[in-house]
Amino acid sequence: MICYELPLNERIRMLLRLEDLFDKIDFFSARDTSFEHHAALVALFEILDVTSRSDLKSDLLQELDKQRTMLEGLQDNPGVSEKALIHILQDIRAAFRGLLDIPGRIGGHLRDDEWLMSVKQRMSIPGGACEFDLPAYHYWLNMAPDARRADLQNWITPLTSIRSGINIILNILRNSGTKFCYIAAKGVFQQAGSEHQAHLLCLHISDEISCIPEISANKYALNIRFIPWRSDHKTEVCEEDVPFELTFCSL
């Protein structure tokens, strides 16, 4: 099965983007080549750009506090695992404290590093990080992999609380969902928007079906069209009926 996630507001969209970027840093920084560590640094700079355009810290604190209050209200509920509840509450409180401890703007330690910012500025130019443009960066890329990895870890570590908060919120969101099985007749599915309210849609489709979903949703309607994955025509729709699973997730 292939999962397609569609965020239905800008806040969730940003959290998903940041989750993806943090995962890329993990993947590339764990490897040894200079190309992979360059890719990790590119992802780190993208995190800096995404977080600079929002009050992410305040949003995370507000949502974590909301979830903590809701979960604390379930402590005497016999239908809820006490062990699991204690664990998630501990994670929320730890992430909350970590966010409060972040001084100033998110990524301030990166913005204060003149060398890093000079590299970031050149990277914004297509092909701008060549050795003749950035000899000091070329030197860094030729350092031992463990030395580069240690630098990457030092730059990423101050963002740990941000990542923890994002992971907690997205985990709660995804696990809140109600799953339904549908069939898109001749590749088209429509539903009144009032039937299910959600902040995130998770659509699962068999990887044997060579179609991709094109989803549009608002408070009035949900429309899904399954189109051939390499279609040259935007109006082309899969001709067969397409079974799929759809999960409506809300905070």
Swiss-Prot record:
Q: Where in the cell is it found?
A: Cytoplasm
Supply the InterPro entries for this chain: ZapD, ZapD_C, ZapD_sf
* Keyword vocabulary terms for this entry: Cell cycle, Cell division, Cytoplasm, Septation
One GO cellular component term noted in the UniProt record for this chain: cytoplasm
- The question of whether Manganese is a record keyword is answered with no
Cysteines paired by S-S bonds: none
A single GO BP term for this record reads:
FtsZ-dependent cytokinesis
User: Does tRNA processing show up as a keyword for this record?
Assistant: no
Q: Which Gene3D superfamilies match?
A: YacF-like (1.10.3900.10), YacF-like domains (2.60.440.10)
* Similarity remark: Belongs to the ZapD family.
Q: How does it assemble?
A: Interacts with FtsZ.
What's this chain's function?
A: Cell division factor that enhances FtsZ-ring assembly. Directly interacts with FtsZ and promotes bundling of FtsZ protofilaments, with a reduction in FtsZ GTPase activity.
> Per its record, how is this protein called by name?
Cell division protein ZapD
Q: Which organism is it from?
A: Nitrosomonas eutropha (strain DSM 101675 / C91 / Nm57)
